[in-house]
């Protein structure tokens, strides 16, 4: 495609939005609930998932309901080069994110997890995937007064949650999840829980593990469990919304219209060979596909 055709076809804003969408294709999520050094554990988890994103990284912690975050451009080791950046992230719960890189898209505002401060509490959000109706939803939200601080699709979910009239928070999240379309995995940090959700087709992997001290861990790939000493206990299934808190794990569905169609690129390219996705070892899948 020539430069003339590109400029004639896409406006600068549209092209920027397209670049941001491609970034979410292969990101890495990690979360932990109930560990005294949650940030450091998340650091190691993200390091194990570094292959899923090299543009930027971030960790958001929950310290007795108060959220705090550090993020930056570069590899996990570069973003947290200064030891004090981890030491200042105190708390027993955390979510982290590594972001995939595309040329011309490096922007600190797009680095996750996102942190939101509302009059009725704080929330954190991290996302892996691609929303097929992102542009139409964003236009609709902006026309109704929504203000975005990034050009990432991720922010759309939080605007939808806040605009829902459902009386319960989980009900608002379910409503928002049924509005967005595409392949996605989300981690939401509330003041008293981590919420994990997977799209109705299970396009991206998301698993839950448990540590010897009872801490619960969520990750895009099981290879991250091995690094932190967690044992796999279950995969997040298509259409599931799972709340993790001091009482344990509560599993629910935000839709009954589900069908497991995980992206084949997870086995071919995205995932690490020592990860297990949907019960299948990635290395084994690659060997079998070559026969």
Regions found by a protein language model. Name each.
Residues 2-238, 243-291:
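Conserved short alpha-helical segments that host acidic/polar catalytic motifs at enzyme active sites
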């Amino acid at each position: 495609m020539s430069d003339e055709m590109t400029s004639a076809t896409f406006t600068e804003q549209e092209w920027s939005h397209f670049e941001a969408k491609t970034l979410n294709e292969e990101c890495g999520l990690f979360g932990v609930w109930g560990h005294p050094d949650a940030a450091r554990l998340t650091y190691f988890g993200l390091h194990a998932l570094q292959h899923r994103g090299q543009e930027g990284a971030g960790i958001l912690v929950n310290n007795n309901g108060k959220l705090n975050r550090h993020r930056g451009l570069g590899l996990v080791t570069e973003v947290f080069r200064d030891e004090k950046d981890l030491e200042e992230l105190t708390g027993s719960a955390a979510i982290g994110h590594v972001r995939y890189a595309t040329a011309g898209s490096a922007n600190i505002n797009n680095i996750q997890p996102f942190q939101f401060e509302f009059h009725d509490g704080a929330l954190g959000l991290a996302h892996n995937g691609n929303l097929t109706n992102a542009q139409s939803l964003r236009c609709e939200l902006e026309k109704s007064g929504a203000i975005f601080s990034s050009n990432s699709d991720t922010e759309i979910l939080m605007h939808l949650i806040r605009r829902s009239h459902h009386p319960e928070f989980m009900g608002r999240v379910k409503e928002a999840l049924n509005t967005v379309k595409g392949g996605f995995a989300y981690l939401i940090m509330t003041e008293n829980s981590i919420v994990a959700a997977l799209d109705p087709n299970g396009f991206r992997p998301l698993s839950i593990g448990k540590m010897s001290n009872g801490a619960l861990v969520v990750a895009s790939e099981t290879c991250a469990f091995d690094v932190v000493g967690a044992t796999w206990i279950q995969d997040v299934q298509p259409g599931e919304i799972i709340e993790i808190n001091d009482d344990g794990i509560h599993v629910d569905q935000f839709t009954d219209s589900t069908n497991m169609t995980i992206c084949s690129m997870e086995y071919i390219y995205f995932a690490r060979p020592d990860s297990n996705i949907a019960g299948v070892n990635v290395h084994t899948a690659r060997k079998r596909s070559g026969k």
